[in-house]
Amino acid sequence: MTAKNVGLPSTNAKLRGFIDQNFSPSKGNISLVAFPVSSTNSPTKILPKTLGPINVNVGPQMIISTPQRIANSGSVLIGNPYTPAPAMVTQTHIAEAAGWVPSDRKRAREFIDSDFSESKRSKKGDKNGKGLRHFSMKVCEKVQRKGTTSYNEVADELVSEFTNSNNHLAADSAYDQENIRRRVYDALNVLMAMNIISSLPTGKKRNQVDCNSAQECQNLEIEKQRRIERIKQKRAQLQELLLQQIAFKNLVQRNRQNEQQNQGPPAVNSTIQLPFIIINTSRKTVIDCSISSDKFEYLFNFDNTFEIHDDIEVLKRMGMSFGLESGKCSLEDLKIARSLVPKALEGYITDISTGPSWLNQGLLLNSTQSVSNLDPTTGATVPQSSVNQGLCLDAEVALATGQLPASNSHQSSSAASHFSESRGETPCSFNDEDEEDEEEDPSSPE
């Protein structure tokens, strides 16, 4: 669409003249073209300063260009409001120019963003994951492989690896030898702070993970062995208490039968009240006995060895426990002994009748022997024959060697001032260590 009448205002706001000219594709010097602008808010248009101040109201959709003679008569000059350079379009395509084509040039902000992203990508590409995390992993692998090594040894190996052309590092890489050694030093400090590796007095680094695992495993095995020994001790105490109950109840039944046969209680001088102790010594022994006024304290002085037996030991020797402590109990006696204890404890009586071997029943002797073979202080192994020899000892010798805690009441000792501990192994006379063990292990048979 072309305009026929054009008015050019002068500086004094008067119309200078009119030009009436019919524009055709072949003639004409000046062409004014108006085309619709999109509905979006377009920025403010800046008119050329060559026209001077203009008082005529011109709409934002009109673009006025200065009159110029165009070499090609079939073309018009159209100014693009978003590009500083004019564009040449033919007159036949004016009707199709409903909008403008954005320029291919990027804005300054786009250039900044693209440059920043490219530089960021280039930095990331240069780093190639070779940060402190990467070096820490490499250092940890080196220390784990060697077990014990030094800083210089690890740094030299990593420098030789990363400076090699086969490891994707160029000669001008930022990770030169000094940088690699610095990162190795930082990685070692981080790993030591995390207790993954430890430093030795000689300056060497040791893989603490493997050392801690081995030490923890050794500590667990020692703790397992200690608990197995506690279980054996608890079983020995349970056995002693059950034998006491069986002996007392069997004695009560025998006295009841004697009263029925004799049709009355025995004479006063023919009975011994429980509890009691028996002191046995040689006839040539000189005994000095002192008794307190209330007859609650007795002081004996012997010039020779003597034996002391309590009532439980005497009852066992009389056969009141049916020979359960030695494993020589018949089926009939075993049936009677099971009837003298609560039903929940009958299974223990059956186990006790098998002899002292029931103390180790259900315990992993193989694992305990393997643990006992290992010296926790030096890590050296003890010969297997010495361990098996210790397990074959009787209860009293095993108690002395510390391998098998058991009661001393099975055999009487001829040592001076030696008391039988069969009655002493009651819950009331446990030492402080046993009381602590009971608090830790509430599921014990007691």
UniProtKB/Swiss-Prot annotation:
Identify the stretch(es) annotated as Dimerization: 219-292
Which GO cellular component does the record give, naming just one? transcription regulator complex
Q: Return the similarity comment.
A: Belongs to the E2F/DP family.
- Which portions of the sequence form the region Disordered? 404-446
Q: Give residues where N-acetylthreonine occurs.
A: T2
Q: Identify residues that carry Phosphoserine.
A: S24, S42, S122
So which domain of life are we looking at?
Eukaryota
Name the Gene Ontology molecular function terms of this record. DNA binding; DNA-binding transcription factor activity
- Full protein name: Transcription factor Dp-2
